[in-house]
Amino acid sequence: MHVLRTKNLNNPFFAYYNINSLRYKFDDLKEILSKTPPDILVLAETKIDHTFPNAQFYLEEYYEPTRSDNSCHSGGIIEYIRKGIIRKRLNDFELKSFENIASELTINKVKYFLLSFYRTERKESKIANIKRFFDELSPILNKATSKYDNIILMGDINIDFKDTNSIGNRELKDFMNVFGLQNVIKDNTCFFRDNESSIDVILTNTPRKLFHSNTFELGISDCHKMVGTYLRVHMSRLKSKKITYRSLKNFDSEAFCLELGTKLKQISYENGNVAFDNLVSTYTDLLDRFAPLKCKTIRGNQSRFMNKSLSKAIMKRSALKSKYLKKKTSENRTNFKKQRNLCTKLRDQAIKNDFDEAFSDLNSNSKPFYDILKPYLTNKGALCNTDISLSENNNILSNDIEIANIFNEYYTNIVEHTSGNRPKNKADDLPTGSSFDIILDNITKTYEDHPSIKAIHNRKSDSQHTPFKFKPVKIKNVFNLLKSLDAKKAVGIDGIPPLILKISAKILAEPLTRIINICISDNVFPTLAKLASILPFFKKGDRSNKKNYRPVSVLSSLSKIFGKILQNQLIDFSNSFLSKYITSYRKGHSTQHVLIRLIEDWKAKLDNGFYVGAIMMDLSKAFDCISHDLLIAKMNAYKFDKSALKLIYSYLKGRRQCVKINSSSSNYQTIISGVPQGSILGPILFNIFINDLYFFFPNDNLFGFADDHSISNSSTSLEELKGKLSDDSKVAIDWLDNNQMIANPSKFQAIILNKSKDHILTDINIEGHNIKSSDLVTLLGIDIDDKINFDSHIGKLCTKTGGQLNCLYRFNKYLSVSAKKLAINSYIYSNFSYCPLVWHCSSTKSKNSIENMQKRALKLFDDSHSLGDFKPGKSSMEVKRLRSLAIEIYKTLNHLNPNYMFEIFKPSENRSSERLKHNIASQRFKQVKFGKNSIRVLGPKLWNSLPNQVKSLPTLESFKNFMKTWGNKDCKYYDKYISYVQAI
């Protein structure tokens, strides 16, 4: 196979292989195919399900694999498409009753229809199963042949193609005749015991375009050979991926810092912008000598534990199996079995050695632990997007520079592409070089009658008489920011790694502080600090569509330092006028708080017999749509001094970006609207811009976090409720239109809740769009059902956790006790730590499911080991959530939480009594379902059961330390805990 592949390297190679359980053979497959990788690889009988993340089966040279799973015991297929081939999944062309994947492949501008399948034997009779298979396949082929000239079907059809007397052979041949298909595989493909058959097929309507169709013995599957064929098309290969990095092999930090200090003294500090440029160039020139830039080629990932002896054993096993299939003697069979067992033994030993080495010192270095286990437990951060091909104007583009320029044009004009309107700024209509005073005057006059500006003027408080100015910064503050840089963050456009900045912080702090203070004095943000490189990351959908990639900005670390200094001062001032309901990007605020407020508001209304409804709004490109001029006008209305406005205007204007694809970059383009979402200042500027939206909802029925906003309302009448939601939505849409933001009513979600068991599915008219309410919506990552029992959300959490536990059980014999503890804390418990108080009052069934997850996790530990904190008597998951609830109440009463949390946890009015002065007011309720089962009722019972000396602890840290033992038998106040449990 290797010789054949080498000779036809530029011809696409299609391969299909019934592997019979992928989870145990994936590393062997990677090793065998590393030298002869197919371009399209389909594996059948994978025997994996949703509990196995894609990251576990990721191959470096391929896109993220596509799967059609059955169960972890049978069936299933997985499809790999090599990077550089345009692939689009065709869900409408897929069979409903069998595992299959339909794809449209574009190779050299020619489209091919590929259907990969595995026909499993069902409980029904084989004849009925075959009939159903062809009955489903025929209409699909009818559609495919009318759209595509080139059809390829690959799969294990479980019908012996060569045996004319076999069941289903006649039906297969009739089907092939109808659609003009031929099977290009002529040899037997399956060798089960003493029976040989040809059940793996490659069918096509253009056999002349395929050549060297054959079977290949890999020695991995129990009884199947791999079938493959070459496409008679010349396909250019992607170039090897190369990366540029700084070599720290001979880096002398002391000599570098010594020379850096000398060089920086020679910089002129008359102009902050010029001084910043000189500092960066001086730093990079010196860094190029001490840590030169180097380039290296990235090879395909080999399994961590693969070594020479195991690799040789795998190759020898393949050869011995091939020899046995050619000549089935007892000696050849024995030799093959011995080699197969040796491979298993060597693999287990290699994995154990690798794990022992990686887990040898988890306390000081846990990175190897995450490197090994992460791909088996989650897809997060595991799949990259380095090789991209785009479809643009009916052309397929694979040149990195062309693609980078297309992305950059799209991202810099994303508002125009989304809404059809190009953002305008007053400076565009003024003579070039106009002073900021003239620009500000024009902006102020343009927006003086704007609804938002009027609303801001009407809501200004007395505390805002002193205009805000940016103040100079101290060397100590800059030094601390330099030392706090994350050394793992990406390197910005200036090529200076954060690690080197941390090393040289003592030398760099003084000159950098001086430059920053000059810029603050001159009201200028350095031009070089406004440059960004953009990395496109694939989201979902068609990979050849540029709209399916989100931009991730990479800024220089020095730019982040300057941004952090401005941000700290902006936060202090903006807190004086920001709505208390603005939750995102604020200290002490979280998604849990806004969701608790929403859910508790719903439950209170439902407890009183109201209908409750909510609209989840869809804001398209919210950060990108912000008008620079309108933002400046709003900040002016909020009493920002002219000098501060000039500095912010300088920060926003003239920002430029390029897009990077591998080692290629696009041209720079100027950003004309929006605030950079990945920047330090972007989030706080977004909050300032959107703050006045809350002024238009005097009933405080707007709930938001970042660009996710929901409107809630209630009524005793369903029709009246629908009218209220429609009117409220119009208010929000009008605000968005007036503020040049894009609302998409057709994508709004709606939910209606009531106290009865019936679901209410109705239409709500919003600006001419009929929005159908649903019984389940997703908000900020939480699935919320119309009965607020969170069964769906907790079910998903338990399913995810169950899959991760399955993985840990498979690795159990390789994991040390400390590694198991780390794995459970990092992955199992973390699943239930996101907004746990939101869904705490769930059904008993759901709570029991969570407890069972913990019990199953604890069974990973053998009785022979010291379990430490993981002893069977470990606190239940419910006790953990109650501890979290007590901490939230403590934070609320001590003003460490958003002020609106006082609406839920109200201090007791009886402050004169020494015994009751630390209590919170008990809440009345009418019904158990929505009244008693709520945080506002449960919280006071929990808090008031705690001893006063605990509730009055002076610091949050001391309170947390106490709560770690609350509920345990060794707790000082265990009797109080028992009384509380009996009370609820």
List the model feature ranges, each with a label.
Residues 230, 234-236, 259, 274, ...:
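Surface-exposed loop/turn segments and immediately adjacent short secondary-structure elements
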Residues 580, 619-706, 715:
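Conserved polymerase palm-domain catalytic core
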Residues 64-79, 161-168, 179-206, 265-269, ...:
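Active site of divalent-metal-dependent phosphoester/diester hydrolases
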Residues 251-284, 771-838:
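Basic, alpha-helical interaction scaffolds
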Residues 152-154, 487-496, 534, 545-554, ...:
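Conserved catalytic palm subdomain of right-hand nucleotidyl-transferase polymerases, strongest
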Residues 1-147, 163, 172-181, 504, ...:
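Short phosphate/oxyanion-binding micro-motifs
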Residues 188-209, 214, 727, 742-776:
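Short, conserved micro-motifs composed of acidic
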Residues 112-117, 126-127, 150-164, 234-400, ...:
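Arg/Lys-enriched, amphipathic patches
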